[in-house]
């Protein structure tokens, strides 16, 4: 049996490999911590009030903007207060993005990738009104028009991007009680989400139509201040992220080709663990593929959904691999047949598949619909918000349970190894050194796997919470740092890169010896190893089944013949 490179690589070469990979890991953390800005930035825009012509209320091509040639004449709050009807059905709340800085107009860059808008509403009632505490889950109907223009276009050349009349539900509290009016402040509500930030400038017009027969927006007194928070990915972070993907992609592809060629040179069919490794490498390659470069040229509103699908495939493959990886090293070979997914792991992997499919369906229900209507959100209704929050909580709990189960499996592996080590003293010294070295290397690799799993689960839970942080009632702010994101992403690549190297078949072949000559040869190996700093484990003969990927898995069948 030739074994794997993990078994046959000398101690010095293995130390050099591990040190090099650790340096790469440190570099990934430093790259995000020292050079990349925060992953996301935001700008807060206070809405401007404009008054529109009655004759053009239903004209969706008519757009009001607050800056540039032909801008609307702003309406002051005093003018609204003096009007007996508070200018009902005449006011348009205008948000123009991005805001200028230092008297200079700024524009969005395609490197910023996406744009999310959330709105905070304040409305007021006359203090003479009987309403003091507004009821919960107030239904607000909003006429939303989103437009864009590009750099170099005239100021008035706004083009309609999307239009919709949507309902949002508000939970409000009393903000201020004055002698003439009472103000109420409401929780933030999701407004729109763009999967591609392809244009330079964006304009949002909001109308709150009043309709007595349909009881539309009659429970509100009058809108006071509207604040839009526009969240975008930072362009500097995108550049660092894509640079990392561009560098890692060819390395992973190259090591996969090298690994699979070595497997096919053997006189056997690939083992289950080798299949899982190549599948895992394929999922990582799909994740590493820097498709985001295309969004710099072509508008791709489906990029967010595609990114979620790619990451979901990788998560499913990585979680499945860890279960198989731990299971294949249980050192329990009761069945004479080769391990298969269906025979040994279908129960474990079914839970992973069901969980990933559930998250995929949840993602399609929101971001899939947003391809047609960017104003849609599953958070808009009380029931939808509860379902979404339940999904996020269940996803976090499931990830934690998975990690605990993986810890249990690895603990069983370590316990089995400890039980089998009792047979080492009865072996020859050379064979005992052989297996002690393998056990030490294997334990180190399993601990690295556990650390990788812990960071992956932590990143997944934090990512799920960050997506829904605008819905938490306690104003919890969760910011994934660039160092954490680039570090975990680099860790995935380095970990899988190392597995593909260490579990590749070793092609060192040694002549098979009879048992009567083995003790003499073992003693010669011991003398030789004493004069050297490293032990080449591959010098030892083995009577293992040639279909096994590692001699460690056949440890239980070894017989001491000293």
From Swiss-Prot:
<dbReference type="GO" id="GO:0031594">
    <property type="term" value="C:neuromuscular junction"/>
</dbReference>
<dbReference type="Pfam" id="PF06664">
    <property type="entry name" value="WLS-like_TM"/>
</dbReference>
<feature type="topological domain" description="Cytoplasmic">
    <location>
        <begin position="412"/>
        <end position="441"/>
    </location>
</feature>
<feature type="transmembrane region" description="Helical; Name=4">
    <location>
        <begin position="312"/>
        <end position="332"/>
    </location>
</feature>
<feature type="region of interest" description="Disordered">
    <location>
        <begin position="539"/>
        <end position="562"/>
    </location>
</feature>
<feature type="transmembrane region" description="Helical; Name=8">
    <location>
        <begin position="483"/>
        <end position="503"/>
    </location>
</feature>
<feature type="glycosylation site" description="N-linked (GlcNAc...) asparagine">
    <location>
        <position position="58"/>
    </location>
</feature>
<feature type="topological domain" description="Lumenal">
    <location>
        <begin position="35"/>
        <end position="239"/>
    </location>
</feature>
<feature type="topological domain" description="Lumenal">
    <location>
        <begin position="292"/>
        <end position="311"/>
    </location>
</feature>
<dbReference type="GO" id="GO:0042734">
    <property type="term" value="C:presynaptic membrane"/>
</dbReference>
<dbReference type="GO" id="GO:0030177">
    <property type="term" value="P:positive regulation of Wnt signaling pathway"/>
</dbReference>
<feature type="topological domain" description="Cytoplasmic">
    <location>
        <begin position="261"/>
        <end position="270"/>
    </location>
</feature>
<dbReference type="InterPro" id="IPR053936">
    <property type="entry name" value="WLS_GOLD"/>
</dbReference>
<dbReference type="GO" id="GO:0005789">
    <property type="term" value="C:endoplasmic reticulum membrane"/>
</dbReference>
<keyword id="KW-0967">Endosome</keyword>
<keyword id="KW-0472">Membrane</keyword>
<dbReference type="GO" id="GO:0007367">
    <property type="term" value="P:segment polarity determination"/>
</dbReference>
<keyword id="KW-0333">Golgi apparatus</keyword>
<keyword id="KW-1133">Transmembrane helix</keyword>
<dbReference type="GO" id="GO:0006886">
    <property type="term" value="P:intracellular protein transport"/>
</dbReference>
<keyword id="KW-0812">Transmembrane</keyword>
<dbReference type="GO" id="GO:0016055">
    <property type="term" value="P:Wnt signaling pathway"/>
</dbReference>
<keyword id="KW-0256">Endoplasmic reticulum</keyword>
<dbReference type="GO" id="GO:0030672">
    <property type="term" value="C:synaptic vesicle membrane"/>
</dbReference>
<keyword id="KW-0879">Wnt signaling pathway</keyword>
<feature type="topological domain" description="Cytoplasmic">
    <location>
        <begin position="504"/>
        <end position="562"/>
    </location>
</feature>
<dbReference type="Pfam" id="PF21883">
    <property type="entry name" value="WLS_GOLD"/>
</dbReference>
<feature type="compositionally biased region" description="Polar residues">
    <location>
        <begin position="541"/>
        <end position="556"/>
    </location>
</feature>
<dbReference type="GO" id="GO:0008587">
    <property type="term" value="P:imaginal disc-derived wing margin morphogenesis"/>
</dbReference>
<feature type="transmembrane region" description="Helical; Name=3">
    <location>
        <begin position="271"/>
        <end position="291"/>
    </location>
</feature>
<dbReference type="GO" id="GO:0010008">
    <property type="term" value="C:endosome membrane"/>
</dbReference>
<keyword id="KW-0770">Synapse</keyword>
<feature type="topological domain" description="Lumenal">
    <location>
        <begin position="463"/>
        <end position="482"/>
    </location>
</feature>
<dbReference type="GO" id="GO:0050714">
    <property type="term" value="P:positive regulation of protein secretion"/>
</dbReference>
<comment type="similarity">
    <text>Belongs to the wntless family.</text>
</comment>
<dbReference type="GO" id="GO:0061355">
    <property type="term" value="P:Wnt protein secretion"/>
</dbReference>
<keyword id="KW-1003">Cell membrane</keyword>
<dbReference type="GO" id="GO:0000139">
    <property type="term" value="C:Golgi membrane"/>
</dbReference>
<keyword id="KW-0217">Developmental protein</keyword>
<dbReference type="GO" id="GO:0042995">
    <property type="term" value="C:cell projection"/>
</dbReference>
<keyword id="KW-0325">Glycoprotein</keyword>
<protein>
    <recommendedName>
        <fullName>Protein wntless</fullName>
    </recommendedName>
</protein>
